[in-house]
Amino acid sequence: MNWTLRLIAYCTFLVFIAGCSSGGTSTAEGPNVVEVTARGLTLEAPDSIASGWTTFQLKNESDMTHFAVLERMPEGIGVVEQQEVVAPVFQEGMNLLNEGDVDSAMAAFGKLPPWFGEIVFMGGPGLIAPGRTAEATLYLEPGTYVLECYVKTNGVFHSYNPSPDGYGMVHEITVTADSSGAPAPTSTMDLTISSERGIEVGGDVEPGEHTIAVHFEDQVVHEHFIGHDVHLVRLQDDTAIEELAAWMDWTQPTGLQTPAPAEFVGGTNEMPAGETAYFTVDLEPGNYAWIAEVPDPVGKGMLVEFTVPAAGESAGSESGD
């Protein structure tokens, strides 16, 4: 059994034994808007927000590409445990993968606590280039959540801080029982992602501001421990699609390693099957791709190129598989 299959088997084991299917208090900017700022290798965000439909605005004020995945933690578990017993394990395993020692990396990943399989990834703003803002809307139940960015620089996950005096690029948020009362957004485009058919988008894409509904038809554990998601990337004439596709696999030494090979403009991180997330983006004329952060997105049908035409022109799209 190769190492990627062993990764799948181990993560699936964690999920099944868990029985899982899926500094000071501050407040949010508004009843349903949460401002998150990526500054350096930190995520700044409120400590407590209301439940219900919530829009996260990730402002990237750093010089690196980031994202902010929202993870619902098991009861009694928070950012302290995540930083003490999860982040170091992943970094240890990544160090070994960087050295080409797959067997030892697998042994390192085996140190993950059983409750790791109980973490539920609930979306959040997708990959976003420096100087840009990503906006994603999702429905949150009360509980303890951790925002995380695990993009890498020099082989080190942003969510891991080698200094014992500080945390990595993570932030704990308590979602209270008080409802935001906000309605679900109204979409201008609909996109479906599944492990069977990849990314599917209906209709032509027109320029302008869009609210894109991302429907997670299913969810599976891929070779890199986690599920599929949807990001939007703007392509240039010199963008190497093979390099971009390979970059989406964090288990590779160059995967999710800064600088990014293209300009990301938003999206949504992974969610359980049956969930819907929304993200807002202003589409200027040009070439783009929908892409998932999974190993071999082309082979999975999770890299789809398309063109946003200038006003009055016809749109075009093509699958990346």
Model-derived features with residue positions:
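Contiguous segments within soluble domain cores/interaction surfaces
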Residues: 60-106, 209, 216-250
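Residue-level signal for mature regions of secreted extracellular proteins and peptides
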Residues: 13-14, 142
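C-terminal motif of bacterial Sec signal peptides marking the signal peptidase cleavage site
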Residues: 16-19
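Bacterial N-terminal signal peptides that target proteins for export
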Residues: 1-9
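Bacterial signal peptide processing site
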Residues: 21-23
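N-terminal low-complexity, Pro/Thr/Ser-rich intrinsically disordered segments
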Residues: 26-38
